[in-house]
UniProtKB/Swiss-Prot annotation:
GO terms for molecular function: SNAP receptor activity. Belongs to the syntaxin family. It is found in: Prevacuolar compartment membrane. This is Syntaxin-21. It comes from Arabidopsis thaliana.
Length: 279
């Protein structure tokens, strides 16, 4: 018997991707177990949306707006996970110290296992998002300075003089544009590094919830006895992902800084040559 069979409310025909279609969306009436079931449904739905956003990274749809939506969805899921974890603890305490029936305890144990499955999928989505956010840069549409058209003048000498002045001004603006490009790239790198740090914190939070979940399930017995064995693998994968994130961020920052410096030097040399020629 699955947890939705114990609900007194309605059944929803929509299957859940994490529990093989077993999970239904229950009506929450204040009972911790019902709230846990509703929380699991909302988390799994949000994780599905998160996966769709992650799959858009590296495509023409990968914009700053998409990255912002990705971060908001990540924070929303983290909040849902925290709330659902708290309700699961309530249900576990009630089973331990109350007069809950054996059927109720089994149903709550299955809820704990469903919650574990959702957390695993969320961890998988976070690792995939972190890898793609480091590998790909979002598409940014920036306005390029427009070229200048020389006005039509009466004499040839005035026309040439005007063209030279416009050319010099255009080259100066190109140097300024290069400076702005360097500043923009540095801001993008800093923003991505901040995002990586936030992802690391969220991964650690989810890993901590795995440990709390294992303790609750152990109190309930051996109904979900495979949770503890997954903790070590989850911790190792999280640690490896964190190390790779930091290495990739450091390498990207070094390469971007060198490229920007070379562009700036080239622009300055070009401006000096033009000024010397014109003088």
């Amino acid at each position: 018997m699955s947890f939705q069979d114990l609900e007194a409310g309605t059944r929803s025909p929509a299957p859940n991707r994490f529990t093989g279609g077993r999970q239904q969306r229950p009506s929450s009436r204040g009972d911790p177990s019902q709230e846990v079931a509703a929380g699991i449904f909302r988390i799994s739905t949000a994780v599905n949306s998160f996966f769709r956003l992650v799959n858009s990274i590296g495509t023409p749809k990968d914009t700053l707006e998409l990255r912002d939506k990705l971060q908001k969805t990540r924070l929303q899921i983290s909040e849902l996970v925290k709330n659902t974890s708290a309700k699961l603890k309530e249900a576990s305490e009630a089973d331990l110290h109350g007069s809950a029936s054996q059927i109720k305890k089994i149903a709550d144990a299955k809820l704990a296992k469903d919650f574990q499955s959702v957390l695993k999928e969320f961890q998988k989505a976070q690792r995939l998002a972190a890898e793609r956010e480091i590998t790909y840069t979002p598409v940014v549409t920036k306005e390029i300075p427009t070229s200048y058209n020389a006005p039509e003048l009466d004499t040839e000498s005035l026309r040439i003089s005007q063209q030279q002045a416009l050319l010099l001004q255009s080259r100066r603006q190109e140097v300024v544009f290069l400076d702005n490009e360097i500043t923009f790239n540095e801001a993008i790198i800093e923003e991505r590094e901040q995002g990586i740090r936030e992802i690391e914190d969220q991964i650690r939070d989810v890993n901590g919830m795995f440990k709390d979940l294992a303790l609750m399930v152990n109190h309930q017995g051996n109904i979900v006895d495979d949770i503890s064995s997954n903790l070590d693998n989850s911790h190792a994968a999280t640690t490896q992902a964190t190390v790779q994130l930091r290495k990739a961020a450091k390498t990207q920052r070094s390469n971007s800084s060198l490229t920007c410096l070379l562009i700036l030097i080239f622009g300055i040399v070009l401006l000096i040559v033009i000024i010397v020629v014109l003088v």
